[in-house]
């Protein structure tokens, strides 16, 4: 059960984190952790999410080496690729002509063919597309609060109802 997002807590001078802890304490599973330890676990979790030490399971070192080698080649040639341009394509026009409000001209014949000049080709069919927006549950990283951990958090200065 996710804590409700409410402006009422801010009006009462209560932080969202404290309101979430209170909500979980009242309506959630058996929470055996004081707010101080809850906040410390939350900040540790936040630091973990924001750290650059995250490694994905599908990380491929060969791909990273290939990408780094390409970026070094591009940097040494003095050419920068624009969006949608592959490494083998010549640069079309200078970047100094680009400014706010400048639109790219569509290639000749696109207007005649009835294609949208802002069309970006993909390899997905419409039925395969996934919306980019996050759901309500995932929209805020604070939804990963400490009670989402699989293990039950406890602290030494919170009254325990279970024999140790």
Curated annotation (Swiss-Prot):
- Name the tissues where it is expressed: Expressed in testis. Expressed in undifferentiated embryonic stem cells.
Q: Per its UniProt entry, which superkingdom is the organism in?
A: Eukaryota
- Which GO molecular function entries does the Swiss-Prot or TrEMBL record give? piRNA binding
Entry's Gene Ontology BP terms: cell differentiation; male gonad development; male meiotic nuclear division; placenta development; reciprocal meiotic recombination; spermatogenesis; transposable element silencing
Stretches of Low complexity bias are at 84-95
Q: Which Pfam families match?
A: TEX19 (PF15553)
Per the record, what is one GO cellular component? Answer: nucleus
**Main localization category:** cytoplasm
Q: Where is this region: Important for interaction with piRNA?
A: 111-159
Q: Where is this region: Disordered?
A: 56-112
Q: Does the keyword Cytoplasm apply?
A: yes
The annotated subunit structure for this chain is:
Interacts with UBR2; does not lead to TEX19 degradation and stabilizes it. Interacts with piRNA-associated proteins DDX4, EDC4, MAEL, PIWIL1, PIWIL2, RANBP9 and TDRD6. Interacts with L1RE1.
The protein's name: Testis-expressed protein 19
């Amino acid at each position: 059960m996710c804590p409700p997002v409410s402006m009422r807590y801010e009006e009462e001078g209560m932080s969202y984190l404290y309101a979430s802890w209170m909500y979980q304490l009242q309506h959630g599973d058996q929470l055996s952790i004081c707010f101080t330890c809850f906040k410390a676990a939350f900040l540790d979790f936040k630091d973990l999410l924001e750290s650059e030490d995250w490694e994905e399971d599908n990380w491929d070192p060969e791909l990273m080496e290939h990408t780094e080698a390409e970026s070094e080649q591009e940097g040494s040639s003095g050419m920068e690729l624009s969006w949608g341009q592959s490494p083998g394509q010549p640069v079309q026009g200078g970047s100094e002509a680009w400014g706010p409000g400048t639109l790219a001209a569509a290639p000749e014949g696109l207007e005649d063919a009835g294609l949208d000049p802002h069309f970006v080709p993909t390899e997905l069919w419409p039925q395969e597309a996934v919306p980019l927006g996050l759901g309500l549950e995932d929209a805020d990283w604070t939804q990963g609060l400490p009670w989402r951990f699989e293990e039950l958090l406890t602290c030494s200065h919170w009254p325990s109802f279970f024999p140790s």
